[in-house]
Amino acid sequence: LPVIVSFVGLGRVFSSDSMPLKLLRQFTIAAYKYIASNKRCIFMFEHDRDRKKLAKLVGLEEQQTIVIDGAGINPEIYKYSLEQDHDVPVVLFASRMLWSKGLGDLIEAKKILRSKNIHFTLNVAGILVENDKDAISLQVIENWHQQGLINWLGRSNNVCDLIEQSNIVALPSVYSEGVPRILLEASSVGRACIAYDVGGCD
């Protein structure tokens, strides 16, 4: 039977150096090799870095892979709009509250710029994560908010409005993503994006 295996990023299993995840990686590779033995199987990726990495690890043939350049968004919802004028630039970080998503780096950047009397508003919207060693605790987030380092918005049901109210959207994730939806949405609205040179963000 035809099989499609779709990836929105390879995740921490393929990027972490922790022993448990290294062991899980070996089991995962073995499972993918078994799946790939079906020549009617297609492995679908959001960007070429992930495709090349997994193809090398699993031994995929090129005709078994395809790159779709992101899952896409609805441009009728995320319509282009002119930037709003603000006294200081507004930067939006909207993501799950994980250290690896790069919020800590944005905080450090804000501290450095603030010491040089350069200011911006850092709006943070996102989902708190439980039972994850990589999670940023609510206590840390509220402490940043109280120090004026961030404007904590919590979980939002209307990210489009937050993007429209921003000048810049930042997602400095330190590990390979798929193609992050928030960056696609920001680009569609016409906002500058900040990200590290990692898979899916380059």
What are these regions (language model features)?
Residues 2-4, 12-35, 39, 74:
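Nucleotide-sugar donor phosphate/pyrophosphate-binding loop at the beta->alpha transition
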Residues 154-166, 188:
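Short acidic alpha-helix that forms the nucleotide-activated donor recognition element
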Residues 192-195:
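Short hydrophobic beta-strand element within catalytic cores of glycosyltransferases
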Residues 29-80, 90:
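Donor nucleotide-sugar binding/catalytic pocket of nucleotide-sugar-dependent glycosyltransferases
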Residues 170-171, 186:
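A short hydrophobic beta-strand element within the catalytic core of glycosyltransferases
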Residues 94, 121-136, 152:
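Glycosyltransferase donor-sugar binding loop
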